[in-house]
Swiss-Prot record:
Keywords: Ribonucleoprotein, Ribosomal protein
Record keyword Cytoplasm present: no
Protein name as annotated: Large ribosomal subunit protein bL33
Family: Belongs to the bacterial ribosomal protein bL33 family.
Pfam family, one: Ribosomal_L33
MF GO annotations: structural constituent of ribosome
Any Gene Ontology CC annotation: cytosolic large ribosomal subunit
PROSITE patterns reported for this sequence: RIBOSOMAL_L33 (PS00582)
Primary gene name: rpmG
PANTHER family, per database record: 54S RIBOSOMAL PROTEIN L39, MITOCHONDRIAL, LARGE RIBOSOMAL SUBUNIT PROTEIN BL33M
Residue runs in coiled coils: none
Amino acid sequence: MRDKIKLVSTAGTGYFYTTTKNKRTMPGKMEIKKFDPKVRQHVIFKEAKIK
């Protein structure tokens, strides 16, 4: 089953993306490099809980 997750910017801007993840194939925390428009550069986004 795919679960919804939130990817939060490590630049400290508060910008986030939402996506889904298959927990069986990827049990660890997700880290991916994506574009943060507030700082206008690609930064690492880390997985966080959706509240």
